[in-house]
Design a protein with these regions (language model features):
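Structural recognition of the beta-strand scaffold that forms the well-ordered cores
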Residues: 19, 37-38, 62-63
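S-adenosyl-L-methionine
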Residues: 2-32
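Central antiparallel beta-sheet cores of small beta-barrel/beta-sandwich binding domains
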Residues: 94-150
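Solvent-exposed coil/turn segments that connect beta secondary-structure elements
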Residues: 25, 41, 66-67, 115, ...
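Short beta->alpha connector loops
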Residues: 40-45, 67-69, 103-104, 126
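A short SAM/SAH-binding and catalytic strip from SAM-dependent methyltransferases
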Residues: 26-53
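C-terminal substrate-binding/active-site "lid" region of AdoMet-derived donor-dependent transferases
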Residues: 45-94
Length: 150
């Protein structure tokens, strides 16, 4: 399979931009990868998940056929009856954050909870606490809004 992949990178003209690693995925160091492709049974995906979650935020993970259970994919596609899943490694954002709003008003406090790329929390500003709405975490990019925001 690795030889097949190498040939395809040459045919596509990207061989100088791709490194194909052939080996035991639980032994090889692929921590610098920007894309990891998997075709592993579900239990192996789950064994590998802690290692994947330590990778640089923004790293893309693609799996043929098998998902990661409670870690919902960022995207699902199908080819016939075969699903494909992709995830983007999220930054760890859970915790307490304090910042000064752009208008220079009193400091605001943001309390975030996180499960993979799913984020929720509360924003306390001017003595009022409210939930963050529509939070989206994609790699190291977090966006949300709150009542009173434009």
């Amino acid at each position: 399979m690795a030889d097949f992949a190498r040939k395809n990178t040459q045919l596509a003209g990207v061989a100088d931009k791709v490194k194909i690693i052939r080996g035991d995925i639980f032994v090889e160091d692929f921590s610098e990868a920007t894309v990891v492709t998997l075709y592993l049974l579900p239990e192996l995906n789950l064994q590998l998940r802690p290692t994947l979650m330590k990778m640089k935020p923004g790293t893309r993970i693609v799996s043929n056929t098998f998902d990661m259970q409670e870690w919902a994919p960022d995207q699902t596609v199908s080819s016939g009856d075969t699903p494909g899943y992709s995830w983007i490694i999220p930054s760890p954002v859970a915790g307490e954050w304090e910042f000064t709003p752009l208008d220079g008003s009193a400091p605001a406090r943001l309390s975030l909870q996180q499960a993979f790329q799913q984020v929720g929390g509360t924003l306390s500003m001017g003595g009022v606490s409210q939930p963050v709405l529509g939070a989206q975490l994609r790699g190291n990019q977090l966006s949300f809004h709150f009542l009173g925001s434009d």
